[in-house]
Regions:
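Solvent-exposed alpha-helical segments and adjacent loops
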Residues: 1-231
Length: 231
């Protein structure tokens, strides 16, 4: 599993715990390796290429906070990272507030204040992010899944003919947690499985959260609903 060293938050850790707890229940013998990726890591491209060659991987964190996410997703879609002119290679993209915007091939600044995830084809918002100090708010995430063909020479005992790459990108931290809940849900398992190897699948998660009254410094939000939208 890949995380950003500088910007790993408590939300990323909650998403990590959600995923590892589920996988341990599915297979108690499963082994995990956690990898941090600092910003401007020089061998980043080489690490991305290795990731697609061996093993099953989960990458956590949006391009706002995890540079590795941008690199992995763009490698899957065979486009240059950090290139806004590549937006139309994707079905969906982030629409960020101006203070949060970063250079990304699948994200751009909002022009009217509505932030979240948009359909690239229509430009319409399909999942919204609203921040509240108390009450009900909204967040969202992108989940990208790719099945990667594994050549016979790299298979264990002639089995395991493919690797799975999963990238969970929340608009904010609670969106990443919501994405983790959707990723482990039996309800959405079929919809998150690509039809064939070599073709990445991108899906949108829409989530609501509750924030009870409390000290303004306490981030006491809890996910109340997380669902996978139909394309």
């Amino acid at each position: 599993m890949a995380l950003s060293r500088q910007t790993t938050s408590s939300w990323d850790l909650r998403a990590l715990f959600t995923l590892t707890h589920h996988l341990n229940k599915v297979d108690p013998g499963i082994r995990f390796k956690f990898v941090e990726h600092p910003r401007q890591d020089r061998p980043l491209r080489e690490q991305v290429q290795r990731l697609f060659k061996e093993g099953d991987h989960i990458v956590i964190g949006s391009p706002k906070s995890n540079q590795f996410s941008e690199e992995v997703v763009c490698h899957a879609y065979n486009v240059a990272p950090y290139s806004p002119d590549q937006l139309y290679a994707f079905e969906f993209a982030f629409r960020w507030g101006s203070r949060q915007a970063v250079s990304s091939s699948f994200g751009s600044p909002a022009e009217n204040g509505d932030v979240g995830i948009v359909s690239v084809a229509t430009g319409e918002l399909v999942a919204r992010r609203t921040l509240v100090t108390q009450g009900q708010g909204e967040d969202c995430a992108l989940i990208i899944v790719e099945r990667v063909f594994r050549p016979v020479a790299r298979r264990a005992h002639g089995r395991n003919d493919e690797n799975i790459i999963i990238v969970i990108l929340g608009y904010s931290g609670i969106g990443t947690v919501a994405g983790a809940h959707v990723a482990i849900s039996k309800e959405f398992a079929r919809a998150l499985y690509p039809e064939r190897t070599g073709k990445p699948l991108m899906k949108v998660v829409s989530a609501t959260y509750a924030r009870p009254p409390g000290p303004s410094s306490d981030d006491n939000r809890e996910v109340t609903e997380a669902r996978l939208l139909e394309n």
